[in-house]
Amino acid sequence: MKAKIVLGAVILASGLLAGCSSSNNAQLDQISSDVNRLNTQVQQLSSDVQSANAQAKAAYEAARANQRLDNQVTTYKK
């Protein structure tokens, strides 16, 4: 008796899964397209952030170099 119930449950579950997998291919394609578009945007934003960080670091180092030069000029004045 238990074997029949388990077999019935397996058949019912496989039927439900087969029905769900083929019903919304258009929606699945749309969602896949949206995910790919969002992944592209995330990669672009990540690249932009890395570029901005590099520019900020370069500006900081330039300011430090200018400060060192200013300090040298004040110490060597006669």
Swiss-Prot record:
Keywords: Cell outer membrane, Cell wall, Coiled coil, Lipoprotein, Membrane, Palmitate, Peptidoglycan-anchor, Repeat, Secreted, Signal. Residues 1-19 form the signal peptide. The modification N6-murein peptidoglycan lysine is found at residue 78. Gene3D superfamilies: 1.20.5.190. NCBIfam families: Ala_zip_lipo. Homotrimer. PANTHER family: MAJOR OUTER MEMBRANE LIPOPROTEIN LPP (PTHR38763:SF1), MAJOR OUTER MEMBRANE PROLIPOPROTEIN LPP (PTHR38763). A highly abundant outer membrane lipoprotein that controls the distance between the inner and outer membranes. The only protein known to be covalently linked to the peptidoglycan network (PGN). Also non-covalently binds the PGN. The link between the cell outer membrane and PGN contributes to maintenance of the structural and functional integrity of the cell envelope, and maintains the correct distance between the PGN and the outer membrane. This is Major outer membrane lipoprotein Lpp. It comes from Proteus mirabilis. The gene is lpp.
